[in-house]
C-alpha cells in the first residue's frame, strides 16, 4: 500500500502543467461581487484519535509502523529534493487511523484545490435548506447545480470565483472555510487571508469531514470521481481503485487532494511548488 502512495506522490511531484483553459487563472482575483449573507460558522477544534495501544503495534511490519512510514517519507523527500519551500503532505488511513504529516501547516498556493471546501460549503447550505439547488449564482444565469459540476468536474475558475464572492468579501470567504479546519488562530499564518493560500492540514481536515459524511454529499463525491483530467495527478498512477479528488495547477503549483477507495481507504493531500522542473 505504501509503495502505491509513493507512486501517487511522484505523479503529483513530476506533473507537467496541463494546457487546459480552466487552469489558466487558478488564483482568485480579489474583486468584489454582489454578496449574499450566509452564516459564517466555526467548529471547535476536533481531537485526534488517541494513539494505538503499543501492544497492537508490536506485530506490525517496519513498513506499516509509524516510524517506518516516516523513514520512507524522509527517503522520498531526499531523493526528489523536496523541501519545506516546495513540498507538503498529509496522509491518513481511515481504518487504522495511522497518519503522517510533513510541513502540513505551511501556506502554499492552493490552485484549484480551494474549490473542494468551497463547494462543500454550498452543499451543506443546500442540505440545511438555506439555498436552493436551482438558485441563480452568476450574472449569466448559471444555477447552483450547474456551478457545482463546472467547478469540481471542469474546474471552471470564473464559476468558482462567483461562488466565492457570493459568500461575501474575500476575508469573509476565508473565514467561512474555517468551518472545516481544526487549526486555531495561532496556528494559521495571516497570509491565509491575503490570497489563495491553504495548507495540506486544512485540506486533510476537509477530506476527513467529507469522508465521515459521505452519505450527505453523494453528488460531490461523484463529481470528484469524474474530475478531469481522468488520467492526471493522483489518477496517473491509480487504475485499480476509485479516486475522488480535486487537483490544482497554477504557475508551478501542482497539487492534489483526495479519497482513495482501497481495501483500507485512505486520504491524501499533496502540495508542491516548482518541483520536477530541472
Language model regions located:
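Bacterial N-terminal signal peptides
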Residues: 9-17
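Sec-dependent signal peptide cleavage junction
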Residues: 16-30
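Short, well-structured active-site flanking segments
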Residues: 28, 124-145, 216-220
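Beta-lactamase-like hydrolase cores
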Residues: 30-106
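Active-site SXXK
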Residues: 97, 107-137, 151, 268
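Mid-domain, small-residue-enriched loop/turn segments at the edges of structured enzyme/sensor domains
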Residues: 101, 148, 159-215
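A conserved catalytic-loop motif detector
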Residues: 196-251
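Short, Gly/Ser/Thr-enriched beta-strand-loop segments that form substrate-interacting elements
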Residues: 232-278
